[in-house]
């Protein structure tokens, strides 16, 4: 039988486990280890001897790798999960998406030239010495510059600037009102500088520049002339006509004037206004016709104050009614001293509206946002209806908003070098005649749709007759507001004449409420329904223009009240 193992084997004696019954000391011979025929294993000398705990659980950090074989110095480092994937294609690194709102920082020309020279030197050296390509330090390509891509969105600041100058606030210049402003300026110089009391009444349709002209002149006077106090009150904000006296006392700022009430307050105000010491007081009452009261005591008292002895009051009233002093205040005609100076503001003409719009837009830039044809079309439409400059400004501003929304919806990607500042760029899109026509049709269609038969928003027949009755009644009585009782009488007479069944008075009130929700009329409710005041919220010319477009309502207006 062949011999497979060496007959001489190494024997290793393991220490025996101590038992409780084993009390003998182990023999030294049993503990000896006899190794025969075993070649010694060469070991690598260890420079740093580090004592480690026996249990691997007690080892921390890199100590757990003490039993792993040592890596050769030429082995590559361990790759992460992201680097173990397939090789990527060559792409631009560090692309930045810059929005147009962020400031762009450009490198200075010298630094940019140095960077170009260094790039040329590197490229030339790489072509001359091919050995440098094998250098391990240059295996990775140099990091390329980050490409700046701008998401250029057309801001259109020209539209924003145009909307700012087309607002309804008091402008620096008021074209087409030089004559009226001259009359007001001379009146104030005469009475303020001469310390002479007086009264002035400004009349005209809405949007003709009455309040704007007076506000601009008062602002200029505060810088030039000292020694006067101006008080501006809008009578529409007052609860009643009698509330004007506490409002005046509060604006004067004297505590002793605010304590009394009723007639005592009026006496205190008269005493204060006729005192020898004190500055001149310019009292401006806008919407003065809202102070209409029983017997017109409030209006008579206000117009009589400037003519008291030693009075320091300069009263300026503003209202839409042309004949307020002649019709409502006939007693002022009897006393020549109490009659105020009258100044009427006529509606703006087509040429005046066009000149105002062009003057406003010329303050922004040379390239106007609105075409000249669009401006002329807007001026012609507004002057034919009311001559209200505020309506023309609103129409143009709304048309600019429509074009601006279209331009903002266009997002364009452009290189950074081609992006110019919005102020330097030309107008991307101008407001044309079609945009003005669209806005005017929307405004007229939302407010009045009386002449459209096949539209769902068209008014019913009874509401049309009620609007015709209100228009005819206000013209006959020459007042802005009528009671519901008088309106119902006029409505009933028109229905009888046109052979149309009329509704009762309670339903007439509900019809007025529906017209109020459409913005056609205004209601001032009272405890008694007959005393509810009804007024038109739209210009008479505008309503008449729409009502005449239909045969039935046109015949009612032509026939008038029976």
From Swiss-Prot:
* Subunit structure of this chain's protein: Interacts with PCNA, ORC1, cyclin-CDK. Interacts with HUWE1. Interacts with ANKRD17. Interacts with GRWD1; origin binding of GRWD1 is dependent on CDC6. Interacts with CDT1; are mutually dependent on one another for loading MCM complexes onto chromatin. Interacts with TTC4. Interacts (via Cy motif) with CCNF; the interaction takes place during G2 and M phase. Interacts with CDH1.
Using the record's annotations, give every residue carrying the modification Phosphothreonine.
68
Q: Ranges of Polar residues compositional bias? A: 1-11
Q: Which UniProt keywords apply?
A: ATP-binding, Cell cycle, Cell division, Cytoplasm, DNA replication, Mitosis, Nucleotide-binding, Nucleus, Phosphoprotein, Ubl conjugation
The name this protein goes by in its record: Cell division control protein 6 homolog
Q: Care to name a GO molecular-function term for this sequence?
A: chromatin binding
Residue ranges with Basic and acidic residues bias: 130-140
- The UniProt gene name for this protein comes to Cdc6
Q: Where does this protein come from, organism-wise? A: Mus musculus
Q: What is the lineage of its organism?
A: Eukaryota, Metazoa, Chordata, Craniata, Vertebrata
Gene Ontology cellular-component terms listed? cytoplasm; cytosol; intercellular bridge; mitotic spindle; nucleoplasm; spindle; spindle midzone; spindle pole
Pfam families (UniProt xref) = AAA_22, Cdc6-ORC-like_ATPase_lid, Cdc6_C
Q: For binding ATP, which residues are annotated in this chain's numbering?
A: 204-211
Q: Which GO terms describe its biological process?
A: cell division; cellular response to angiotensin; cellular response to vasopressin; DNA replication initiation; positive regulation of chromosome segregation; positive regulation of cytokinesis; positive regulation of fibroblast proliferation; regulation of mitotic metaphase/anaphase transition
User: What family does the Swiss-Prot or TrEMBL record give for this protein?
Assistant: Belongs to the CDC6/cdc18 family.
The sequence motif named Cy is recorded at: 94-101
Compartment(s) of residence: Nucleus; Cytoplasm
- Residue ranges annotated as coiled coil are none
- Extract the PANTHER family matched here: CELL DIVISION CONTROL PROTEIN 6 HOMOLOG, CELL DIVISION CONTROL PROTEIN 6-RELATED
Q: Does the keyword Nucleotide-binding apply?
A: yes
